[in-house]
Amino acid sequence: MERKILNRYPLGNTKRVWKQKDFILSSFQGKGKNLRNAVMNWKESGLTCVELGWASHEEAWTVANLCEEIGLDLIFQDFSEFGGMQEWHREDVRSETMAKDIADKIRPYKRTIGYYVWDEPFKDDQLEETRRQIDMIEAEDPERLGFTVAIPSYNGIYTWENGEFPAYLRRFADIIEPAILSLDYYPIGIECWEKEGQLDNSRMWLDLEMMRIICREKKLPLWFYFQSYDLHKRGSGFIFPMARMMMYAACLYGAKALQNFTAPSSITNMDGDKGQYFDEFKVINREFNMLGNTLMALDSKFVFHSDDLLTQTMETYKEGMPTDKICDSTVLDGTLPKRTSVGELHDEYGNKYLFVLNRDYEKENEIKLSFKGEKRVYVVDRNDGEQKLMKENCSELVLKLCAGDAILVRVQDAGEEAFAIEYKLEA
């Protein structure tokens, strides 16, 4: 079977210098009593990047040196010198001179790809200060990312219930003009999560849809922080398939980075040793490292959900409610079974992919997809990233997906010439 080599290109806000070349698997915070062990374990687990949110001076420079030595990318923050978190912030970066001092310190660190400037700015003065600091740092060090992350809709001020979250997220993107759009959402154990209902009525889906809309409008890569442990301590009975489902869910919406909150509570423990989900994350991180090259070439075209998603709604949810209908797809037909979601993603050459997700994080789900016409289906193999023929001349596809799992397939008309695709980064 012929293999076509298709170019893909770096992604990012055209108003910023920094561009994303590869799929990123990162984690918030560099914590651990033995930081050398921690960084080595994060590297072994398949993470490609560490983020130093809220880092002390000692932690920041210790981890920066270890990442340089061990070979792990870093988004740097030394809270004693710059940056902020919501309303609490440092005001030390007041001038271009101070920004230059920080950039000069970082310049020798080749594995440091960016600066963690602000965690969850939400008021307008915080958004403006975040923009100011990113602009100053970019002027001194334009090849590195000025990173910030938006606050989720359960923040208590800008919510879906009062109708103010969509406007907040737009202001975040318009005022800051970030190189990428990142959002965190940790749904297990908070309101709209239910033991029986799982995440069927979680506003996480509204936040993801709002992100997708803005990323499409501004041509921004979508980054998503997912929950990887029992953060809220409310008897959720947190299990790894919950994290797996959230990781795959973000990719239905076109995510180009998955941000673990947090590796020191899931991949490692606070001593820096291997943690409760080390083995599980090592497997799934390897899978995403194999899928990542293809995912970087794809844009989210549609996201379809079974009709049991978001059955409890309000008028103020309207802007984030799923509007894509299977009848709009040129690939899918019919309806989706319970707790099933499908992202339809296209590359710039017109090739079409389906990311099929079992949203049920407690049990296996048999998923039957119906196609419009006869199709040829290729699986994007999670072991090596290659496209392999899965089924020919089919009008339907039956999949068995374990709890919270997903599969990425490419679909073409059966009458077309068969070929696999490999994407090549054209810098």
Give the residues covered by each predicted segment.
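Glycan-processing catalytic domains of CAZymes
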Residues: 1-374, 379-420, 426-427
